[in-house]
């Protein structure tokens, strides 16, 4: 892989490394960070999420110098430090849709490093439940004259379905271990506090019921998980079933299962997936967007579009907010970025 990257990359190239909220092209990310900075340097990284240490190692080692991104949650403190040291020049902090759009305008990757669950002998890719950003990255790169390199967990004779056709992919590399997928941090409802339950009840009665919020996008957090859990109990006691919260842009949160099983929820389109939810998703293809094989195909670009144009409401979080409601996710000590929240 090192020899391949040294042969393909040139100083100043725009490189899209697939760092999603969950799925990470971690093998290729580490290979990129291990390159010789005398041969490959001043890369312009264009990627939605900075999640792994290797995503910033490329700047610390002088392999990359410029960055356009959307979210850096786990690496936000280190990112701020590297910016302060002058090792990273930030082009812009985008929403997901802004960044995806610029992939087709002025930030078209010359090389894309992506992750897939499997490839067949022809090079077709199966991206599975955590498809996330892969389609938009590959399409912009492949049809923009760029080079697509995919790391895969396995190479098989027949795929469950084809998510990315082989003629959009230039190189396939079987990684030594499965790519990293970050679980959602709201997996354990026991961590929901009594205050968050109270806030959820206030939101359901004072906002959802009052405004008839029926199409919505929940950000990931225990505040929203509390609302999801209370739908078939508290919300139903208010006579709200069939009136609110039927159609969702949302990852397949375990906290949503009771609302689905009670018939509160009619449809869910997802940005990503959730480890351990595969069998449940396959069993509820009437609710989730699944393929003929039963597995879900998430799509962050389409879910962000739905969140912006097709939803009544969004709940998210921020680092700072003033009395006028202006907010920021870039502070002196942290540069987290908004992800898709401003949509």
Tell me the role of every PLM-derived stretch.
Residues 1-343:
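Conserved alpha/beta enzyme-core scaffold
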């Amino acid at each position: 892989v090192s020899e391949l990257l040294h042969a393909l990359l040139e100083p100043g190239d725009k490189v899209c490394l697939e760092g999603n909220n969950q799925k990470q092209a971690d093998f290729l990310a580490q290979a990129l960070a291990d390159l010789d900075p005398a041969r490959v340097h001043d890369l312009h990284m264009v990627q939605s999420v900075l999640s792994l240490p290797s995503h910033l190692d490329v700047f610390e080692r002088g392999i990359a110098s410029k960055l356009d991104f959307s979210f850096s949650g786990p690496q936000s403190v280190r990112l701020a430090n590297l910016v302060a040291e002058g090792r990273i020049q930030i082009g812009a902090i985008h929403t997901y849709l802004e960044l995806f759009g610029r992939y087709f305008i002025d930030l078209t990757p010359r090389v894309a490093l992506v992750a897939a669950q499997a490839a067949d002998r022809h090079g077709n890719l199966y991206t599975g439940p955590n498809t996330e950003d892969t389609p938009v990255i590959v399409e912009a790169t492949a049809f923009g004259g760029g080079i697509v390199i995919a790391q895969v967990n396995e190479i098989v004779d027949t795929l469950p379905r084809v998510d990315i056709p082989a003629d959009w992919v230039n190189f396939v590399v079987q990684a030594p271990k499965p790519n990293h997928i970050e679980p959602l941090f709201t997996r354990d409802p026991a961590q929901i506090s009594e205050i968050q339950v109270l806030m959820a009840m206030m939101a359901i009665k004072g906002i959802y019921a009052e405004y008839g919020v029926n199409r919505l996008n929940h950000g990931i957090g225990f505040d929203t998980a509390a609302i999801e859990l209370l739908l078939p109990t508290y919300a139903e006691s208010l006579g709200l079933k069939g009136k609110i919260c039927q159609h969702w842009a949302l990852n397949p949160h375990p906290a949503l299962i009771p609302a689905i099983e009670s018939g509160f929820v009619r449809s869910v389109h997802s940005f990503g997936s959730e480890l351990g939810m595969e069998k449940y998703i396959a069993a509820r293809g009437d609710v989730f967007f699944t393929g003929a094989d039963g597995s879900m195909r998430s799509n962050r670009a389409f879910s962000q579009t739905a969140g912006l144009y097709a939803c009544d409401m969004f709940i998210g979080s921020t680092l700072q907010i003033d009395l006028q409601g202006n907010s920021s996710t870039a502070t002196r000590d942290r540069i987290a970025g908004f992800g898709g929240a401003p949509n």
